[in-house]
Amino acid sequence: MVVVRLARGGAKKRPFYSMVVADSRNRRDGKFIERVGFYNPRATGGEESLRIQMDRLTYWQSKGAQLSDTVSRLVKQFGRQQKAAQPQE
């Protein structure tokens, strides 16, 4: 089964996560098919904390990929950020 999940990177006590499409049998930080975004929980100031390539994510979902619980939460958060960033008419 193909899943979209977070793969941990970064240094000790400074996590950085890549949002990857991977086979569920592979290790968390192991081999993956495609990187579709990132999440930086320790972003400060003007740094970008979350980026998702929504076109690629919807493509993989159409192919049957399942989102992990955390990725589902982050996708909703990203949608709210995008909606808030759009200028009001």
UniProtKB/Swiss-Prot annotation:
SUPFAM superfamilies: Ribosomal protein S16. Signal peptide: none annotated. Belongs to the bacterial ribosomal protein bS16 family. InterPro entries: Ribosomal_bS16, Ribosomal_bS16_CS, Ribosomal_bS16_dom_sf. GO terms for biological process: translation. This is Small ribosomal subunit protein bS16. The gene is rpsP. GO terms for cellular component: cytoplasm; small ribosomal subunit. One of its GO terms (molecular function) is structural constituent of ribosome. Disulfide bonds: none annotated. Keywords: Ribonucleoprotein, Ribosomal protein. It holds the Pfam family Ribosomal_S16.
